[in-house]
């Protein structure tokens, strides 16, 4: 009966499995430290705290040992590597193992399926399932759990339910983990009523919901604005002696701050402390983000300083959130102080950090500082992206450096394969503002040749420029084209607020 699963699920054959990972993807020359005998490493607690580079070194020591280690030994290393969330590496190791003639067993196949699912490569996961069953291995409930998670990860909820039906027909009984996976997928798809029905089904079957079940449902209900249902769920959770954990509190706090209910979020934080649940980085990051969103920068900085005193130290996300908050409200020098502190504490600024600061200094007219940050970013080997270039382009335009903006724009077109309509909108808008409507019109007319399709914003900018400084005939022609393309409503909506929509904030929102 269980062979139903082969025909019902694993319709994808194992073709292409060996080609899924490029052997050069992770670099064969990864740093390898000298190990004592690999058996000693596997026997001790080394795997519990293994680092990525150590996993690589240990793997290559194992495959070059004589005799070769057993699949049980390799499975222990695969498990440890998967726990590091290095799923592609596990796939790479598995590929190498096959080349060395090391045969998989049920456990290693299950790990491989799990990693393919985590990488959203379901066709390969199903290929492995088919292969293992052809070799006589029956999948376990853990194997099916990984596949379920994979289906839910790519929003194939219908396929996930079909898999559960096949599991039941084949004699497998869904457990709490299976139900939790389905409930999570349903909540993320907005199917909360079905998720709640599954909770009732669990109770009827005598499967007690755990803290993960309730956390998932609470988050889904809150994000859908079903506050009364969420409150009822929380009461039911505590009534069943399932104590809220850090995930519960953090999820609720995050929802409250995003909804603008900051007072409720802070009350929940106090309740969290009173319940002896220690907030983590995610908790503090959510609170800081909410405070920054609503302009309460003093409170955000106070919370930032509070973290360390509570033994929870800021990470890159924390710094980026607060820097973004300061820059949003034009307090760029405060943002720069945090950037410098971040570097002193050993954190490497990422592309988001640099883009935020460059944008902030462009907004306050300190273009020279923005360009210096850009140069520093490149010197630190952080590669600028299209957003970085668009922010600088916009900064040059709004600060009257239109000739420099044209040079920048031409550089972007030469270096980027596709710069997109946003960059064109910024440049056309800058030219119109600088009374260079003819040049803007030339650029607009070049869009089809460049393979870039104008959007409502492009038409609006160009029509306004023509109405102010150019021939009305071309403006009328563009309005006619907008009607033909069904975007005249956008023009009407913006027509009453022309100055507002040509502001730097509105323009840059198209970039970020």
From Swiss-Prot:
Entry protein name: Pentatricopeptide repeat-containing protein At1g64583, mitochondrial
Major location (coarse): mitochondrion
Positions annotated as PPR repeat: 70-104, 105-139, 140-174, 175-209, 210-244, 245-279, 280-314, 315-349, 350-384, 385-415, 420-454, 455-489
Subcellular location per the Swiss-Prot or TrEMBL entry: Mitochondrion
Keywords: Mitochondrion, Repeat, Transit peptide
Family: Belongs to the PPR family. P subfamily.
Recorded GO CC terms: mitochondrion
């Amino acid at each position: 009966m269980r062979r139903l699963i082969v025909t019902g699920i694993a319709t994808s054959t194992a073709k292409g499995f060996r080609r899924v990972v490029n052997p050069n993807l992770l670099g064969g020359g990864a740093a390898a430290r000298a190990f004592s005998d690999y058996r000693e490493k596997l026997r001790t607690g080394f795997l519990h705290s293994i680092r990525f580079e150590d996993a690589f070194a240990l793997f290559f020591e194992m495959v070059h040992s004589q005799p070769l280690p057993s699949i049980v030994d390799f499975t222990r290393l695969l498990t440890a590597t998967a726990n590091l969330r290095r799923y592609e590496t596990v796939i790479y190791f598995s590929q190498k193992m096959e080349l060395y003639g090391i045969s998989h067993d049920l456990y290693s196949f299950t790990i491989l399926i799990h990693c393919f699912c985590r990488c959203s490569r379901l066709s390969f996961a199903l290929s492995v399932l088919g292969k293992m069953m052809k070799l006589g291995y029956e999948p376990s409930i853990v194997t099916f759990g990984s596949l379920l998670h994979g289906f839910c990860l790519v929003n194939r909820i219908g396929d996930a339910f079909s898999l559960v039906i096949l599991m039941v027909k084949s004699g497998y009984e869904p457990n709490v983990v299976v139900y939790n996976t389905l409930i999570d997928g349903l909540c993320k798809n907005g199917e909360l009523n079905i998720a709640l029905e599954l909770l009732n089904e669990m109770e009827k079957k005598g499967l007690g919901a755990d803290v993960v079940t309730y956390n998932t449902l609470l988050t889904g209900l809150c994000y859908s604005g079903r506050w009364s249902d969420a409150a009822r769920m929380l009461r039911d959770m505590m009534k069943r002696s399932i104590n809220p954990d850090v995930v519960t509190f953090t999820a609720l706090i995050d929802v409250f701050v995003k909804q603008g209910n900051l007072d409720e979020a802070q009350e929940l934080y106090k309740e969290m402390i009173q319940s002896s649940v220690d907030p983590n980085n995610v908790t503090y990051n959510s609170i800081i983000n909410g405070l920054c969103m609503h302009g309460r920068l003093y409170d955000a900085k106070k919370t930032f300083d509070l973290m360390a005193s509570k033994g929870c130290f800021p990470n890159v996300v924390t710094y980026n959130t607060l820097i973004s908050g300061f820059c949003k409200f034009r307090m760029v020098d405060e943002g720069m102080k945090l950037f410098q502190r971040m570097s002193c504490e050993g954190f490497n600024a990422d592309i988001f950090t640099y883009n935020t600061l460059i944008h902030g200094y462009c907004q306050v007219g300190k273009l020279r500082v923005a360009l210096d940050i850009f140069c520093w970013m490149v010197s630190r080997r952080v590669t600028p992206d299209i957003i970085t270039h668009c922010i600088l382009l916009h900064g040059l335009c709004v600060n009257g450096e239109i000739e420099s903006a044209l040079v920048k724009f031409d550089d972007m077109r030469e270096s980027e394969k596709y710069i997109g309509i946003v960059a064109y909108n910024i440049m056309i808008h800058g030219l119109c503002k600088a009374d260079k409507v003819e040049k803007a019109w030339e650029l607009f007319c070049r869009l089809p040749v460049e393979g870039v399709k104008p959007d409502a914003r492009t038409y609006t900018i160009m029509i306004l420029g023509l109405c102010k400084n150019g021939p009305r005939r071309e403006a009328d022609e563009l309005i006619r084209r907008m009607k033909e393309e069904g975007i005249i409503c956008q023009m009407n909506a913006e027509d009453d607020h022309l100055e507002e929509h040509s502001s730097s904030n509105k323009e840059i929102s198209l970039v970020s």
